[in-house]
Every structure is written in C-alpha cells, then in structure tokens.
Amino acid sequence: LGDVYKRQVLSNATQIHRDSVRRALLRVDNNILKLDSAFDATVRRMNNPQSASYTVRGIVEAMKRFDGRMILQTMFLRGECGGQPVDNTTEEEVSAWLRLVAEIRPQQVMVYSLDRDTPCPTLEKVTKEELQAIAARVEALGIPCSVA
C-alpha cells in the first residue's frame, strides 16, 4: 500500500524534540507539523498547550532538526477567546511568523482558517484573499505554499 498511498501524519509538534518521535515522523511521506504563531502568548491563546515549558523557540529549534523534511501548517484566525483578543493576521504576527518560516525552511507550507465551529464562538474565519496574500509572502521566500 505504501507504493499507492502516501502516509501522512499531522502533529501539534509538542513532542518533536524527542528523538524517537522525530525519527518516526521522518519515516512517513508527509510529516505535517503545526505552528500557529511566532509568539508564545498567541499560541497559548489559540492552542492552550498543556506543557508549562512550551515555547515557540523550542518548537522552531526542533523543527529545524528535520532539515526541511516537513510540511508546516498554520491556522490563521482572529477574534476573542476567554475574554482575550487573538489575531495572528496582524502585520506584526505575520512578519514574525514569516521570519520563522524562513528559518525552519520546510518543504512546503499550508495555510488555512477555521472550517467548523470552535469552543469560542467569537473567533472569526480569515478570508481566502487574506490567506492567499500570506501564501504569496511565503512563496516569495522560495517555499511552496497551499491555501485551504
């Protein structure tokens, strides 16, 4: 079946610092790792990582160990959750995220927005046009980018 179907794994990337996890992910055809912001505070609002030691820098350093053999996936959204504003589409957010993309050098980037209801009904989907503008900036780095 491996000759006919590609094996894909989507991971929140919180365990990729572990050698056993990294080795396993390198064995699949499409190793898709999530990173939704360049800022710890935004990631905490969006994803609520359970590890107190989670840092974007730690995830980025672990992603770099894949030497480009990964696909980076990022969800863009805006709104409010738990009384806190969240928006990873601002120029500050996108520019900082693009610097990390350039540092990680994944084989591909996938950008998308909300596609179903969330626990926070005040979160808003980002338009396809906004996602395409972000994708164009990724492609300007020489990295293919798809919009979903």
Question: Where do the model's predicted regions map?
Answer:
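Short beta-strand/loop segments at the ligand-binding rim of alpha/beta enzyme cores
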Residues: K6-V9, R69
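Active-site beta-loop-alpha junctions enriched in small/polar residues
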Residues: N12-T14, D36, M75-G79, L114-R116, ...
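Conserved strand-turn element in the central/C-terminal portion of the radical SAM core barrel
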Residues: N47-P49, A62-E91, V111-R116
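Short, electropositive alpha-helical surface patch
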Residues: C81-R105, L123-R137
